[in-house]
């Protein structure tokens, strides 16, 4: 099967997953404590976020999806238009197809041509050569480079890689060689605390935990196998909220993606420490079903609703959500117990003094 056919398969199967999804994931195990006098005035709310010296107008980004075929190039064009119209940052899908076949360059370059002033991230795997990583950045004039980690995808992939031991050293080489920030990310199986703590030694200063709960690439690749004999890998890894809880105080900025279904999930991820939050599968489904205008409307609605949540919770900025009290329930609570995570600290982050301050600082 050609690389272009595989990319088209990924889009089809990811969209089918979104349509069949049960709707529940571990973000439902995170709830805000409601303080009825904590609210502020909507004009006081801002959505801009800053992490690792990078400032985005919005704490929401369109995460890595696709590229490498005529069909996926058209999808990338529409995604770029949506990013341009809303101000959201955007990431390319894996650019490995471009390294194999430079004739598909325009399916990735369109992310920049349609969005000349936006924040665009290139995307390579951990086996990419330094030269190819630079080519990826140059092709789309990228502002940052994502390096994706995907052992649980490669393992069931019929044509997948089976050699992972060189990845840390190669990440270090790429990070040292490119002139843009590097963001190491998973593809939906999560980054553990141990993995995150290893990244600074490789020169990495930002990570996207990209946990379980959204598109399941192990399931996608297994469905491409004649016997479907890797079904036991479906649902592998840690959820996005589990990763964020596991990563408390790692000492460098984190982004969050994987299983983001609505603005409340965005707020939950920000409250657990993410500097910004990405979505892929939900946005892809909206684009496929309704076109670029529907996606622009969805992103705009999410941003308006996120600002409404911040207003109700008393968070003037996305970062202020980390001062809001949250409760951890169900299986996520069990994960925290097993990993030795003190969840009580999240339930007692605000104080009555905070609420009194908001009352005296706003007109009721």
Swiss-Prot record:
Q: Which residues bind FMN?
A: 64-66, 94, 123, 185, 210, 215, 259-261, 280-281
Molecular function terms, GO-annotated? FMN binding; isopentenyl-diphosphate delta-isomerase activity; magnesium ion binding; NADPH binding; oxidoreductase activity
| Top EC class, one word | isomerase
Q: List, alphabetically, the SUPFAM superfamilies matched.
A: FMN-linked oxidoreductases
GO-annotated biological processes: isoprenoid biosynthetic process
Q: Which UniProt keywords apply?
A: Cytoplasm, Flavoprotein, FMN, Isomerase, Isoprene biosynthesis, Magnesium, Metal-binding, NADP
Can you tell me which residues bind Mg(2+)? 154
Query: Is Flavoprotein there in the keyword field?
Result: yes
Task: Tell where it localizes.
Answer: Cytoplasm
Endpoints of the signal sequence: none
Keyword Metal-binding on this protein?
A: yes
Primary localization class, coarse: cytoplasm
Region annotation (Disordered) maps to: 1-24
Feature: compositional bias, Basic and acidic residues: 1-13
| EC number(s) reported in the record | 5.3.3.2
- Report any Pfam family annotated for this entry: FMN_dh
Q: Which GO terms describe its cellular component?
A: cytoplasm
Catalysed reaction, written as an equation: isopentenyl diphosphate = dimethylallyl diphosphate
User: By its UniProt entry, which NCBIfam families does this protein fall under?
Assistant: IPP_isom_2
Function description = Involved in the biosynthesis of isoprenoids. Catalyzes the 1,3-allylic rearrangement of the homoallylic substrate isopentenyl (IPP) to its allylic isomer, dimethylallyl diphosphate (DMAPP).
Family under the similarity heading: Belongs to the IPP isomerase type 2 family.
Q: Whom does it interact with, and what assembly results?
A: Homooctamer. Dimer of tetramers.
**Name of the molecule in the record:** Isopentenyl-diphosphate delta-isomerase
Q: Which organism is it from?
A: Kitasatospora griseola
């Amino acid at each position: 099967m050609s690389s272009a056919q595989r990319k088209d398969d990924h889009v089809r199967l990811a969209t089918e997953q979104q349509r069949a999804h049960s709707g529940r994931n571990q973000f439902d195990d995170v709830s805000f404590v409601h303080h009825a006098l904590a609210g502020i005035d909507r004009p006081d709310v801002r959505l801009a976020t800053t992490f690792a010296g990078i400032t985005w107008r919005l704490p929401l980004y369109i995460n890595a999806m696709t590229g490498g075929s005529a069909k996926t190039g058209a999808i990338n064009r529409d995604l770029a238009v949506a990013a341009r119209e809303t101000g959201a940052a955007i990431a390319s899908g894996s650019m490995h197809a471009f390294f194999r076949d430079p004739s598909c360059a325009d399916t990735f370059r369109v992310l920049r041509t349609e969005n000349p002033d936006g924040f665009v991230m290139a995307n390579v795997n951990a086996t990419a050569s330094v030269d190819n990583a630079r080519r990826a950045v140059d092709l789309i004039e990228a502002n940052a480079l994502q390096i994706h980690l995907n052992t649980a995808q490669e393992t069931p992939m019929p044509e997948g890689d089976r050699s992972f031991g060189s990845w840390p050293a190669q990440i270090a080489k790429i990070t040292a060689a490119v002139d843009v920030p590097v963001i190491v990310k998973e593809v939906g199986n999560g980054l553990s605390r141990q993995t995150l703590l290893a990244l600074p030694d490789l020169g990495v200063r930002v990570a996207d935990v990209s946990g379980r709960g959204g598109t399941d690439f192990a399931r996608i690749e297994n469905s491409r196998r004649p016997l479907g004999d890797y079904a036991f890998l479906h649902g592998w890894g840690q959820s996005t909220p589990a990763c964020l809880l596991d990563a408390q105080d790692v000492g460098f900025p984190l982004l969050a993606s994987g299983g983001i279904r609505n603005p409340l999930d965005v707020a939950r991820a920000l409250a657990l420490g993410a500097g910004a939050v990405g979505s892929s599968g939900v946005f892809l489904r909206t684009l496929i079903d309704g076109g670029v205008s529907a996606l622009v409307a969805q992103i705009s609605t999410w941003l308006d609703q996120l600002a409404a949540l911040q207003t109700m919770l008393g968070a003037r900025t996305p970062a202020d959500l980390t001062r809001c009290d949250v409760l951890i329930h169900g299986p996520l609570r069990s994960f925290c117990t097993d990993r030795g995570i003190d969840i009580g600290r999240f339930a007692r982050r605000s104080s009555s003094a905070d609420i009194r301050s908001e009352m005296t600082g706003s007109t009721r």
